């Protein structure tokens, strides 16, 4: 989904769309990275657009419901006496950092083999030291075209310069 350095400091957050789901990854005050669905539990409003960055609390733009970096509801208004804020935390997403890369699973029951995947991947990722990397520049290039052509174009060398 992303890399750990994209949420380098406590309070940093990154929003990424994965299929039809929008996910917020945040680094909490203890340095752990957490993942949540980018949907307010009040009226189902998407809290931030893809690519947005925020710092600190997660605030819904619709009615200002405010969530902490742990996903727990911190602020709300005009709810009945029987309202239970503890039952209205952000819905978590299984998130794991492996070698500095962030992996998510949207299933309510994530597969149990993530530890095996981490064991296999860590040695390959370790030489790249992704955990210490910093984003120096980012650009989006959007092209109209078939993705298969883009991939195939990079698999042969007809466009390489002569040696």
Give the label of every model feature segment.
Residues 12-61:
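Glycine-rich active-site/cofactor-binding loop and its immediate structural neighborhood
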Residues 1-32, 66-163:
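Rieske [2Fe-2S] iron-sulfur-binding subdomain
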